[in-house]
A protein has these predicted regions:
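Conserved NTP phosphate-binding and transfer environment spanning the P-loop NTPase/kinase superfamily
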Residues: 5, 26-29, 174-335
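Walker A (P-loop) phosphate-binding loop of P-loop NTPases
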Residues: 62
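Conserved lysine of the Walker
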Residues: 65
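Post-Walker A helix-loop "phosphate-sensing" segment adjacent to the P-loop in P-loop NTPases
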Residues: 74-84
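Charged, amphipathic alpha-helical linker segments immediately N-terminal to NTP-binding catalytic cores
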Residues: 1-41
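Hydrophobic anchor at the beta1->P-loop junction of P-loop NTPases
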Residues: 55-57
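Conserved nucleotide-sensing/catalytic segment adjacent to the nucleotide-binding pocket
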Residues: 84-87, 93-144, 158
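Hydrophobic positions on the alpha1 helix immediately C-terminal to the Walker A/P-loop
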Residues: 68-72
Length: 335
């Protein structure tokens, strides 16, 4: 069982101290190197064990699973291993949705994935076959014809499977325990003022807001309005997946509030302005709802957005141009 690694605590004073001409680049470098060391540690363990054929990477939304997985694949390849990424996001089917009491569709549960196909493809890869995986378009929320080349790892390569449900029984159950390594990735941190400002869930929400605006054609109030569904669904799986993991990777970067808070504040402000002018676009997450309304609870979302504004205005800002091109933050910034 993995244990949550040491929680990172950053104060507003710490963030202000980082902003010096020389201090910020050095602090960014230390934070990024810490994350790289996590990846290298996992890669070393997998590469040194010839029995390992699969790495399962799990974690809640906006934890950096994709970037971590891509880096891990690269690290394994650098150690002479043939390795590929298999993303469970491409196996969304959305054929049978459930809903919460306010009409939010559940896009987070394992039932929204075609786990039968994912398990077949994974088994074929491990056996040495070449596989063309499906493609899911998050803008249209539909599976589209895949144009990706087939992937293969031969008889001794490694598949790195990533997704919220990367450690579910449907994926791990076909393998002996010695054949795979489990990784649970999640930011585990708090940003402090006189009392706590932001916790780990808030940090992920801000990452998700920034990503949804830039990657998925959504505005900030859409993400905030849908967040209760994300939280409730994750609670059903969180402990089980952490228990099955061998490692917890803390994906929080100590300098990230300087960048993410600034962008999220801008995104929230634009959404609230549109709301007040009566120009707010309906939530893309409610398009498949079982009730006919544009948002699950827009009043609650607006109240949360205004609270976030108060918190985020206390955090000093740095431009996203300071973020290295290889940073996990680029998964959310779309740089």
């Amino acid at each position: 069982m993995a244990n949550l690694s040491d929680k990172i605590r950053v104060s507003i004073d710490d963030l202000e101290d980082m902003l010096g001409v020389f201090g910020l680049p050095e602090f960014i470098s230390k934070a990024e190197n810490r994350f790289v060391r996590h990846t290298e540690e996992v890669a070393d363990r997998v590469a040194s064990d010839p029995k390992k054929r699969v790495v399962f990477v799990s974690g809640p939304t906006s934890s950096g699973k994709t970037t971590f997985t891509d880096r891990l694949v690269s690290q394994l390849q650098a150690r002479g291993k043939k390795a590929v990424r298999l993303s469970l996001d491409d196996y969304y089917s959305l054929n049978a949705l459930s809903f919460d009491e306010e009409g939010r569709p559940d896009y987070e549960s394992v039932e929204t994935l075609d786990m039968r196909l994912a398990s077949i493809d994974l088994a074929r890869l491990v056996s040495g076959d070449a596989v063309q995986t499906p493609t899911f378009d998050f803008m249209t929320r539909t599976r589209v014809e895949s144009t990706k080349p087939a992937i293969s790892i031969g008889k001794e390569g490694i598949v790195v499977v990533e997704g919220l449900h990367g450690l579910c029984e449907e994926t791990t159950g076909s393998f002996d325990r010695e054949q795979y390594l489990g990784v649970f990735i999640m930011p585990y941190a708090s940003v402090m003022a006189d009392s706590r400002l932001l916790d780990s869930d808030d940090i992920r929400m801000l990452r998700r807001i920034v990503r949804d605006v830039r990657h998925r054609g959504a505005h900030a109030l859409t993400t905030i309005d849908y967040w209760p569904m994300i939280q409730n669904s994750e609670q059903d799986y969180y402990r089980d997946y952490l228990t099955k993991a061998d490692y917890h990777v803390n994906s929080f970067l100590a300098y990230e509030p300087l960048v993410i808070a600034s962008l999220a504040l801008q995104d929230i402000g634009e959404a609230l302005d549109a709301y007040e002018k009566g120009l707010l676009v309906p939530s893309v997450f409610m398009e498949r709802s079982n009730v006919k309304k544009d948002f699950a609870n827009i009043e609650k979302a607006v109240a949360k957005a205004k609270m976030l504004q108060v918190w985020l205005r206390q955090i000093p800002q740095a431009k996203e141009t300071f973020v290295p091109k290889t940073s996990i933050l680029n998964e959310f910034l779309c740089l």
